[in-house]
Amino acid sequence: MQYHDQSLQTLKLGKKTEYISTYDRTLLQAVPRKLNRDDLGISTKQPFSFGADIWTAYEISWLNLKGVPQVAIADVEIDYQSENLIESKSFKLYLNSFNQSQFENLQQVEQILQQDLIKCAKGQVKVRLNSLQNYAQQPIATLQGECIDEQDIEIRCYEFDPNLLENCTNKQWVEEKLVSHLLKSNCLITNQPDWGTVQIHYIGNQINREKLLRYLISFRQHNEFHEQCVERIFCDLMKFAQPEKLSVYARYTRRGGLDINPFRSNFEPIPLNQRLARQ
């Protein structure tokens, strides 16, 4: 059995599990980033210098010291240089374990979340808990850029094929932000669909939009975690388009009270966590 198979075999994802309602940090499970990065040839050195897995957790509740339930929404940033990514079902089960446990205040819960996620990810993690009153003021955002989805083309390829990007640039030097709402991949373990919007910001020779859209649609039956898909897109664009500067940012729809929004760039900092219409 390969190391890749052994690491994934222990995950709770796709298995019947018991929901525990008293705090238990051991419910968190890690997936080594090395698994996917070995395949991409970037385990030793990544082609991006900025990045995070930006999570929003909508289903967080605990009891105060008088036994009254409290609720909040969390913004979580897991640094791309962390050794592990966090497996999503284990994160959901872990958050559920707060439900019947008492904590002094929101700040204590925030501190515990951050400490536990740092240990699991083995890297930098930022956590901010938001009251519902504060979060309700956050507007629905849009990713800036030109949408490439309305092209009048015929699509027949739904199997992942990076070679669809071959000869994808012309000689015109541009800075562009391109957006597609048609990103869809499948969970590596359960095969459940993952729906996302992706923004590609680059400086370099102009990328052919038809080729780019065909490439993105080819993820439609591809099985990989969200974070891995974004790193694959980044690496493929660097290989075939060879831009001077590149950012890839995907915002995926919510599942189990969590959305995951990976960002990778070689030139710009991590964006604010602003939800889109489908989130």
UniProtKB/Swiss-Prot annotation:
Reactions listed under catalytic activity: 7-aminomethyl-7-carbaguanine + 2 NADP(+) = 7-cyano-7-deazaguanine + 2 NADPH + 3 H(+)
Matches recorded under Gene3D superfamilies: 3.30.1130.10
EC annotation from Swiss-Prot or TrEMBL: 1.7.1.13
InterPro entries tied to this protein: GTP-CH-I_C/QueF, NADPH_dep_7-cyano-7-deazaG_red, QueF, QueF_N, QueF_type2
Subunit structure: Homodimer.
NCBIfam families hit by this protein: QueF
Subcellular localization(s) per the UniProt record: Cytoplasm
Annotated gene: queF
Pfam families per the UniProt record, alphabetical: QueF (PF14489), QueF_N (PF14819)
Example of a GO cellular component annotation carried by this entry: cytoplasm
Entry superkingdom: Bacteria
Positions that bind NADPH: 88-89, 255-256
Residues the record lists as binding substrate: 86-88, 226-227
Organism: Histophilus somni (strain 129Pt)
Stated name of the protein: NADPH-dependent 7-cyano-7-deazaguanine reductase
Stated role: Catalyzes the NADPH-dependent reduction of 7-cyano-7-deazaguanine (preQ0) to 7-aminomethyl-7-deazaguanine (preQ1).
Keywords linked to the UniProt accession: Cytoplasm, NADP, Oxidoreductase, Queuosine biosynthesis
Family that this chain belongs to: Belongs to the GTP cyclohydrolase I family. QueF type 2 subfamily.
Stored SUPFAM superfamilies: Tetrahydrobiopterin biosynthesis enzymes-like
Gene Ontology biological-process annotations: queuosine biosynthetic process; tRNA modification
Active site: 187 (thioimide intermediate), 194 (proton donor)
UniProt keyword NADP, yes or no: yes
One example GO MF annotation: preQ1 synthase activity
Enzyme kind, highest EC tier: oxidoreductase
Principal cellular location given in the protein's record: cytoplasm
Pathway noted in the entry: tRNA modification; tRNA-queuosine biosynthesis
Origin organism lineage: Bacteria, Pseudomonadati, Pseudomonadota, Gammaproteobacteria, Pasteurellales
